[in-house]
């Protein structure tokens, strides 16, 4: 299990958001990919849970570039919802595109999912959930911001 793991964070269940102290996620790791589908990447993040016998098992794995892209996606979404209240439906049905983020010679399009038949209700619930999670999100954004600022110094 520890083969090719370089960085580890044990005890994740203590800080897992609203699941803190009740989470099934026990450990986060960074190292060489373990899943065949990720072998082309050099580094991946792994999420570990206990199986029914209490042994740690790999629950999820993502290459680090996908984690960064999820952070870009989430960050842009958070920025979008800061001003979405100005739109009656929280989005413009005629212009669902939020931003096209340039990456790797192409783009990561970020848009409201107008294919969702219940988007008008779901986007309101999503916005309310972001508001309800404000304290959890805010704390993590502050920590992430501090670390990103430190990275800029290198």
What are these regions (language model features)?
Residues 67-76:
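Elongated alpha-helical scaffolds
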Residues 153-154:
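C-terminal non-catalytic accessory extensions
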Residues 53, 57-65, 106, 110-113:
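Short, solvent-exposed segments of well-ordered alpha helices
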Residues 96-150:
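Charged/polar low-complexity intrinsically disordered segments, enriched in acidic residues
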Residues 25-60, 82, 89-103:
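A short, structured beta-strand/loop element
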Residues 1-38, 53:
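N-terminal "first-domain core" detector
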Residues 77, 81-84:
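Solvent-exposed amphipathic alpha-helical surface segments
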